[in-house]
Amino acid sequence: MRARPLTLLTALAAVTLVVVAGCEARVEAEAYSAADRISSRPQARPQPQPVELLLRAITPPRAPAASPNVGFGELPTRVRQATDEAAAMGATLSVAVLDRATGQLVSNGNTQIIATASVAKLFIADDLLLAEAEGKVTLSPEDHHALDVMLQSSDDGAAERFWSQDGGNAVVTQVARRYGLRSTAPPSDGRWWNTISSAPDLIRYYDMLLDGSGGLPLDRAAVIIADLAQSTPTGIDGYPQRFGIPDGLYAEPVAVKQGWMCCIGSSWMHLSTGVIGPERRYIMVIESLQPADDATARATITQAVRTMFPNGRI
C-alpha cells in the first residue's frame, strides 16, 4: 500500500507496545491443542459439499498424528536469536510460526497490538467472498479481477471500493466475530489500513481459513490462497513485496499477504504473513517496527526470517 502516516495512534497508544528485545522464545504447543481447536469453534459443522470434497482431495487435510518437524526443535533458539539481532538494529519483532500438522506454535512471546496496513485486505476479501457465497452480492468478472489484483499486488483502489461497498468497519467486526479474533478491531477513523490485530490472531485467521472453520466456504478460501500464492514482486504502487517470508523462505512455496506503513512515530512497520510449504503445513506471521528508512527496515525483517530458517526452508 502507499506509504502513509498511521492515523490510529490514539488507539495504539491505548495499548502498551511491548518491547521484546532479548525476550525468551516460547514453544506453545498447548495453545493449539486439538481440544482447544474444538472448544473455541462452532460445534455444528455443515456436511461437506462436493466442491469441498474436491478441494480436500487437492489440498491434504491436517494430519494430527504427523511426526514433529525435527527443525522445529531448534526454532525457539533461532527465534530468540532473530529477535535479539533485530533489537540490536533498533527493531521490535513480533513473530509466530504454527505447524498445522502437529499444532506446535513457536513465538517470541510478543503479542502486542499491531497495525495491519494492507494485510487488512484479507478481511475485505473474506467478507466479500462470503457475501457472494451466501447470495447477498453478485460479483462481476471485473469485480473478481479487482479482488485478485487487490490480493496479489496490494491494490489500494480496489480495497477502498470494496471497503466502502461492504460496510466499512463492519467488515472487520464480522470477520473477527466469525474467526474469534480477540485482538482484531476495526479502525477508529474508518480507514481500512488502520485495522489492528496481533500475531496470534493472524495465525488463527489463516489456520481457520484453511480448514473452513471460520465460515468461509473452502472453494472461496481457495480463491484467497491462490491469489496469495501469486503475490507479485512489487505492489501496484511499485513498493517491493518480497520482504520477510518470500525472500527469507526462498526454497519453499509460499502464499503471502504483505503490509507496510511509514511514519509510526519515526518508524517503518513491515508485516509479512502467509502459509508455507507444498501442503500448506505451516503458517507464519512476522512484524517489525524499526526507526529506519524503508530499505533498511525491509532488510531487517527479511534477515530475521533467514536467521530463523538459514536454509530457506522450514
From Swiss-Prot:
PROSITE patterns: PROKAR_LIPOPROTEIN (PS51257). Keywords: Cell membrane, Lipoprotein, Membrane, Palmitate, Signal. It is a lipid-anchor. GO terms for cellular component: extracellular region; plasma membrane. GO terms for molecular function: beta-lactamase activity. Transmembrane segments: none annotated. A lipid is attached at residue 23 (S-diacylglycerol cysteine). GO terms for biological process: beta-lactam antibiotic catabolic process; response to antibiotic. It is found in: Cell membrane. Residues 1-22 form the signal peptide. A lipid is attached at residue 23 (N-palmitoyl cysteine). Its main location: membrane. It comes from Mycobacterium tuberculosis (strain ATCC 25618 / H37Rv). This is Putative lipoprotein LppW.
